[in-house]
Amino acid sequence: MNNQGRSILAWATLFIFVILLFNVFQSDSLLGGRNNITFSDFLTRVDEKTVNSVKIQGRVIEGTSNDGSTFNTYAPDYPDLVNRLTSNDVNIEVVPLETRMNTFLGFLISWFPMLLLIGVWVFFMRQMHGGGKAMGFGKSKARLLSDKGPKITFKDVAGIDEAKEELTEIVDFLRDPSKFQKLGGKIPKGCLLIGPPGTGKTLLAKAIAGEANVPFFSISGSDFVEMFVGVGASRVRDMFEQGKRNAPCIIFIDEIDAVGRHRGIGMGGGNDEREQTLNQMLVEMDGFEANEGVVIIAATNRPDVLDRALLRPGRFDRQIAVANPDINGREQILKVHLKKIKYNSTVLARIIARGTPGFSGAELANLVNEAALIAARLGKKEVDMHDMEEAKDKVLMGVARRSIAMSEKEKRLTAYHEGGHALVGLYCPAASPIHKATIIPRGNALGMVQRLPETDEYSQNREQMESSIAVYMAGRVAEEIIFGRNKVTSGASSDIKGATNIARAMVTKAGLSDLIGPIFHGSSGDDMYGRQPNNETSEATAELIDAEVKRIITQGYEFAKDILTKHIDQLHTLANALIEYETLSGQQIKNLLSGRALDSEEENKFPFNDSSTIKIDKEKSPEKTKTTKAKKENYAS
């Protein structure tokens, strides 16, 4: 029987016991179980000499009639009762009140509260620690992975080849240690997987468990610390003892930052239970006693908060970065997940990978699942590319809110706002290509223009950052040109925030301001408490930084205004098309502005050679370097 069944059975038994006990009291109560009559009726029967005998206990009278029937009644304070009974020849028996209750029942009543408390305590201890281990607080909660169920191998892991290679070496060592030992090599004692959420750290651990033919224990960092002092350290000792008994083996600790944070930051100056647990883990991983054959693999997305003693070689010999996949990695991941659904030939993993820069493996898996759900909702037998595009838009831009009743005025304003973003994006020399423009409300935005880089970008140059600022400001500029300064709305608030962040990064981090120079200003990140450290920038320098940020944003604003003023006719054309069609792809926008059919697939090198504006020539424009993070740029109204 499983734990849930035992729990239900225990509660049912307790409930039945209480009911039976209640019935005992009821059946044996002072007035229960017999024919109750009034005291007046009782006196009448006595006077009529129909009562043979009575048993008096306190004020309760149990009587027997001449015909053998029994009855109960309750007597008030009636001093002449005994005289009246004897005068009518009634046999009287008096029973002391305390002897009415039998010995067992009295014992049960006196000890029942204590027995109930003990029973509840034992029950909860069994639930917390399983099968009778009421005193097993210090036992490790590490679970030995079973061979039953689906097995995950390295074939199921894609897009993180470097991490796979490092971990494959550990698996090979466990399988055939002589291959490495003949050259004097030793198995790594520990391996730390570092990366943002959703990149596949836990999936890699599952693949190791599937590949290595050795015992595999898994535990969460939060499983060590309990409300009782010393339990965490005891569980660490027990976990390593299990590992030694099953060596060679692998122990996987997920979210190790829950127990491995910096020491010495306990609040109140008291002895921190988590700190004791960490100290025990440090000793077990690399102390006086050898741990041959026990490999520790841990995962975290917060390596900055881990104690330095935990990260040193000898404990975690390897730190493997599991980053978001590049375009090739995303394509491989998509192919793995596409195998699990039914799709037709229109679905191209490469195109989807290009349109999802910065996506983690978990996000790509969610995208494929969303596409399958959309196709099922529409009654399709297979997933097609349209479903994938709709799922991508849903993940990137939010759920389409077609139920919103927008007035014609709001719809027209949104169309010009998004048209301004798109048009300036086409004319900026270093802006990423326009992927889609829409005035269908999604998420918290009334409309959106999505730009996607042709390749993954890991850094940006000055021209790219200035172009991004101009595109951000273009929506507000379009509103001002078409509707006037007094009609500008708050819809550009998120655009202004994005432009300000880029401009401030140019000045304080990238050193792209001639006035401030190549000097880093601001904090380098949160401290161990998650707070921003004190800023060491002087007030005078802070004023200069603010002035430079304003200058850069104003420059981008004027640049966008110049483009939209010179190409006002194209802005009108694009806005009217958005009002009519609601959503336009980047190719459709180029076709529209170049006078071609909207769905023409001919190569279109828009914009044209126009001396009145900036000519976009990809071959002559400065070579694009790569951005710190593959970006998904959405410009919301």
UniProtKB/Swiss-Prot annotation:
It comes from Rickettsia conorii (strain ATCC VR-613 / Malish 7). The active site is at E418. Its cofactor is Zn(2+). Residues 603-637 are annotated as: Disordered. Homohexamer. The gene is ftsH. The lineage of its organism: Bacteria, Pseudomonadati, Pseudomonadota, Alphaproteobacteria, Rickettsiales. It comes from the Bacteria. Keywords: ATP-binding, Cell inner membrane, Cell membrane, Hydrolase, Membrane, Metal-binding, Metalloprotease, Nucleotide-binding, Protease, Transmembrane, Transmembrane helix, Zinc. This is ATP-dependent zinc metalloprotease FtsH. PROSITE patterns: AAA (PS00674). Acts as a processive, ATP-dependent zinc metallopeptidase for both cytoplasmic and membrane proteins. Plays a role in the quality control of integral membrane proteins.
